[in-house]
């Protein structure tokens, strides 16, 4: 699943290396608009609906955090 997440992130912002272990929000790799686009893409790709209460910067700060959020929403 992590490779799929990295692919989605790279398509969204190709100028960054999302395989790094850094905070994507803190490092300026993702902004609020990017997070909205990412949520839409994740919803469509994985057939889920991420709840608005889960759209918090800390849930999108790393590949691992995004994976945890997806698992919370039933993605295996």
Where are the regions a protein language model picked out?
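Conserved catalytic core of two-component sensor histidine kinases
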Residues: 36
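Thiotemplate assembly-line natural product biosynthesis machinery
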Residues: 1-17, 68-76
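Aromatic/hydrophobic pocket-lining residues that form π-stacking "cages" and hydrophobic walls in ligand
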Residues: 39
């Amino acid at each position: 699943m992590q490779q799929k997440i990295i692919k989605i992130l790279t398509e969204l912002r190709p100028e960054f290396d999302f395989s790094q272990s850094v905070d994507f929000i803190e490092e300026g790799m993702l902004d609020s608009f990017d997070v909205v686009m990412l949520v839409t893409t994740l919803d469509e790709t994985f057939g889920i609906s991420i709840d608005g209460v889960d759209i918090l910067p800390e849930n999108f700060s790393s590949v691992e955090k995004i994976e945890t959020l997806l698992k919370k929403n039933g993605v295996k």
